[in-house]
Amino acid sequence: MAALIYRQLLTNSYTVELSDEIQEIGSTKTQNVTVNPGPFAQTNYAPVNWGPGETNDSTTVEPVLDGPYQPTTFNPPVSYWMLLAPTNAGVVVEGTNNTNRWLATILIEPNVQQVERTYTLFGQQVQVTVSNDSQTKWKFVDLSKQTQDGNYSQHGSLLSTPKLYGVMKHGGKIYTYNGETPNANTGYYSTTNFDTVNMTAYCDFYIIPLAQEAKCTEYINNGLPPIQNTRNIVPVSIVSRNIVYTRAQPNQDIVVSKTSLWKEMQYNRDIVIRFKFANSIIKSGGLGYKWSEVSFKPANYQYTYTRDGEEVTAHTTCSVNGVNDFNYNGGSLPTDFVISKYEVIKENSFVYIDYWDDSQAFRNMVYVRSLAADLNSVMCTGGDYSFALPVGNYPVMTGGAVSLHSAGVTLSTQFTDFVSLNSLRFRFRLSVEEPPFSILRTRVSGLYGLPAAKPNNSQEYYEIAGRFSLISLVPLNDDYQTPIMNSVTVRQDLERQLGELRDEFNNLSQQIAMSQLIDLALLPLDMFSMFSGIKSTIDAAKSMATNVMKRFKKSSLANSVSTLTDSLSDAASSISRSASVRSVSSTASAWTEVSNIASDINVTTSSISTQTSTISRRLRLKEMATQTDGMNFDDISAAVLKTKIDKSTQLNTNTLPEIVTEASEKFIPNRAYRVIKDDEVLEASIDGKYFAYKVETFEEIPFDVQKFADLVTDSPVISAIIDFKTLKNLNDNYGISRQQALNLLRSDPRVLREFINQDNPIIRNRIESLIMQCRL
């Protein structure tokens, strides 16, 4: 019979579920490892900050504090501070270009009255008069001369509690620190050939890049971090800076874990971020002396660069957040210069840069964890923008600078004119830098930040180098790709396809020939014959059947089987405990939920309709379990489904599982079932209608719900294809024999075909009404 397809789906859907569970168990197998952290470990508290774990190192990120290094003579790199950490009084550092600058620094202990001391400077004994009036602070003094035979003069003393000093070669000058901690600041000495100046350090020292000068000043004023002051920090030779380290590859694809369909990939990438700001300058109406707005706006930038010998195409979007609104009002006259609003980004602002490139890391960026990034800082300086007035000198907005420092990374989506891109959003915090900005020929001057007038300063782009690392869940087959759009969009598209397919299915109901339908309903439709009309390859058909089974196991019919199994178990235990009790609840509990509704037949007499309706909803499963020779509702449902599948033009592998499952649940919702005992028939429908009548005369008799419950448990259940009202109408108008009546009651397909071939209007109308109930 055609209903075989539903029984196959019920059986095989649980096979699919079992297979899925076995694969899941295999993929989630774990190994327990016991770690003894020792008696001093803080084992009672979880980490406060959950990080991504190890992030592979790269060449692009410099350490803030590099060292300590042993005393030595070398040529320090330009634009790097030497942070000197002497432990005793005496000569700290000396350096010369051997032309016009000899500079040395000495350290004097606290509480030293004026005294003459001998120091060895550049290999010569030199007498120097020194003093330190401070009772607690050490004193650094610079000794400088401009000729080899000249006398030393003292400059730029620094009173220091931490006993730290700094010197740097930068921009044709030698910079040092002076003043008094904790408010020390920098000064400088001009020199020629500054880049060739060799330094001799007589104490341990550190190297700090100019970009981290604020940190260097913090150390000078407040001391080194506590970990640098332990005996575990051992100075090394300066030549160790030249050791070639084995660094991570610019491109790394690492398989973290793998299952049957998915794998976790860790992607590590060296990246070059190029970005630019965009702005909007709007002029007000009038005589041309007023501007309404100078503001930032998002800017897209596409570029290529080389990574590990491979050309990478990248796309960035730069936007700002937390801007500061300024204005300038030169007066109330129509010819007075006015800017109603101009935006400035400062230390309370953020810059967002969304980055995407065409590498494998961004192909499947949907399910991502352990995202981390290390990026260098970059300084952005403002250029000159002239406000063109009709008459008079142009006001010029000039200057302004900020530094961008990495403050985090998250997932984002970039929207271009043609496509949306899953990307990474790098967040940057800002710090203001020199010079301040001003508007020439106005009173606006000495303000800090980067104004929106000309933020790129005639540069095509700013550039940041860095590295990111992430772990992404991707398909095991590299040819597959997770969808760019989110699941909601995909589901909405599927719902649209299903809606169109439902309309097509419902319209096809009128094209089904009833004689062919009866023949098709008698065929043993299995999954292969059911889906054979769909144009697809064998592999696609197998995949389609699997998808149908996976969807079908979540249907209400499959859920009813699970509930029924529990009910059978409860009924068996109930009957074994009280075998002598024969009530509706104990007898029918195997197939109904009557035990939850009523326990006494006298109390439930008024709710027979409710009881029979509840019983009828379970009789579909009872009928499947006790298959008879008669045709049932599922045979008609499956035959109609097969006919519509063959005729459909919109069916595909995505919609078929939904349609088959919906058909099993929604086709022929108004069903009636009957049981036969001798000459009596008891019939009940899902909508709560019930009848009891004689076979020969179709005379109605009182409906005995107790008897119905007993027969449902012990006798075959039959689909009332031709229901009581149709039978009675047929008998009243045409007259039928007892044998014909029994065959129609048993839903004998041969008798049904005879009536249809004879074009009996009553039977034809009944079958047509069932076909019209096969709607989605």
Curated annotation (Swiss-Prot):
Start and end residues of each stretch annotated as Spike body and stalk (antigen domain): 248-479
Motif mapping: YGL motif: 448-450
Cystine pairings recorded for this chain: 203-216, 318-380
GO biological-process terms attached to the record: permeabilization of host organelle membrane involved in viral entry into host cell; virion attachment to host cell
Coiled coil spans: 484-518
Sequence motif KID motif, location on chain: 644-646
Region (Spike head): 65-224
SUPFAM superfamilies (UniProt xref): Concanavalin A-like lectins/glucanases (SSF49899), VP4 membrane interaction domain (SSF111379)
InterPro entries in the cross-refs: ConA-like_dom_sf, Rota_A_VP4, Rota_VP4_MID, Rota_VP4_MID_sf, VP4_concanavalin-like, VP4_helical
Site (Cleavage): 231-232, 241-242, 247-248
Residues with site note (Binding to sialic acid): 101, 190
One Gene Ontology term, aspect cellular component: membrane
Protein name as catalogued: Outer capsid protein VP4
